Structure formats: C-alpha cells, structure tokens
Amino acid sequence: MEEKQILCVGLVVLDVISLVDKYPKEDSEIRCLSQRWQRGGNASNSCTVLSLLGAPCAFMGSMAPGHVAFLVADFRRRGVDVSQVAWQSKGDTPSSCCIINNSNGNRTIVLHDTSLPDVSATDFEKVDLTQFKWIHIEGRNASEQVKMLQRIDTHNTRQPPEQKIRVSVEVEKPQEELFQLFGYGDVVFVSKDVAKHLGFQSAEAALRGLYGRVRKGAVLVCAWAEEGADALGPDDKLFHSDAFPPPRVVDTLGAGDTFNASVIFSLSQGRSMQEALRFGCQVAGKKCGLQGFDGIV
C-alpha cells in the first residue's frame, strides 16, 4: 500500500536572495557576491526538507498568477505534491527580498505579503483527509485554521488509532490572534520570538509557562537558536538537545522550517521525542552551513 503523505499548510513565497560580504549601510550601494531565486515560505520550506529526508509530502497554500511557473516547477523538482494548492483569481503570490550576510550567515527579510487570500476552511473542506498521516499547519489566518483543525479532530474520532492523522501547529509570529492555535495539535512549535514577546527568557521557561495552553497529551516544542531546543510533554518531562552548529554559518534562511520538518519526519517514523529533537537540531545545524537546502542529507 502506498505510504500516506505529510501535508503542510501555509505560505509559499518567491525569495530573491542576495549574498553580501557585509550588511549594507543605509543609502549605500554595494555589489552582491551572488543572487538567486528560491522558493520560500515556512510551510513551503518544510515540504522541501521533508522531501529531501524521503517523506512523501504535499503543500497546501494560496497561489496566483505571477511567479507561479518557477514556484510550481520547483515544488515538482523536489517531488512535492501541489494538487492541494488553492488557486486564487485575484492577488499576487508574495515575494521577499532576502539579504544574507556572508560573514555570519544572518538573514534579513523584507516581505511583500500581498493581498492574496490565505487558504480558507472552505478550501480545506475539499481535501481528502484519508491521504495523509500527518498535517502541519503554519499559523496564519487562525480563525479559519481553527475550523480546519476541528475538521481533522472530527475525522479522527471516526478512525481506528492507527489511521488517525497526527497534527502539528506552528506559532511563529507574536500576534495575539495566533495564540488560540496553542490549543490544537499533537505537537505545537512555539518560536523564540513568541516566547520572548510573552516575557520568557529561555526555552524551558517558555515551555513551562505556556504548556497550560496546549491540549491534553500534546507536546510543546521551542527552539532557541544556538542554545538548541527543548520540548515538554504531558508527563512534565523536559527534553533538551544541544545545537549542532556547522564549522561556519553561511545561511540561516529556513533553519527554523528545517528544524520543524525534521522533528515531524522523525516522529512520523516512530522515533522518540528525544530522538526527534536531536535530529531536528542536527539537520537544522547542517542547513546553516549550506546555501539553500541541497546537501542537508
């Protein structure tokens, strides 16, 4: 029987990436070392990583005329199923200008988040849930995404344990509307930015302070850059993995998406939370030593 897919729901962006010797001063002109187009967006990047790791995966997000040919071709080149894409007749596919500092790998992003509508609960109603073993949702239009998550919950109540879809949610941006998503999903990824916005100064403090927001039995995960990542589960056991920095950091764009995808992949393969956390940090660390995603495995 064909292996079920992992579905990632969220954003796809055209990233125009300029690699520079050092970050430019305002009102200056510099030459870049190189420039490339790259398919970006959190859910889109996570699909790239899942596919590179060997997982059958699909992307669901909104797309519109514009840079679509490049983006769709790149999804297909990576073996990512785009049959769930919500095609929009109005608006433009988002794009971003990304500047990567070659001296330290830091990335600065200027996003043109266009008027393109996000995937709606109505769009999600058309999805055949039986195709998927795991669905990951990048927090965006939370009120609609709650309806999507409730649909998955309803579907799962009618399934035997081995057929239930596992669900993960990413709360990355410090926006109040997104915080309702904490209450959904078997695995919830909360970002360092959100944790600091809510007053926490470490991953462990964030997990202990926010765990009361997640559903019974869920695992809350927080990556903290060079300090590694922590996870907290229902038995109050804290897991930790150190970071695995590369010999030289060259490109951190998409490192968080790489971490999330690697944790999801590992858990979907039946690994323990400790193993998944370590694997996520290892793959994300390797990615930081590479331009783009090729070579992470």
UniProtKB/Swiss-Prot annotation:
Nucleotide-binding in keyword set: yes
Binding-site residues, ATP: 107, 225-228, 254-257
Known regulation of activity: Requires potassium. Inhibition by ADP.
Pfam family, one: PfkB
Entries under InterPro entries matching the protein: Ketohexokinase-related, KHK, PfkB_dom, Ribokinase-like
Alphabetically ordered keywords of this record: ATP-binding, Carbohydrate metabolism, Kinase, Nucleotide-binding, Transferase
Residues reported to bind beta-D-fructose: 15, 41-42, 45, 257
EC number: 2.7.1.3
Annotated metabolic or biological route of this protein: Carbohydrate metabolism; fructose metabolism
PANTHER family according to UniProt: KETOHEXOKINASE, PHOSPHOTRANSFERASE SYSTEM TRANSPORT PROTEIN
Complex and partners: Homodimer.
Protein name per the record: Ketohexokinase
Gene assigned in the entry: KHK
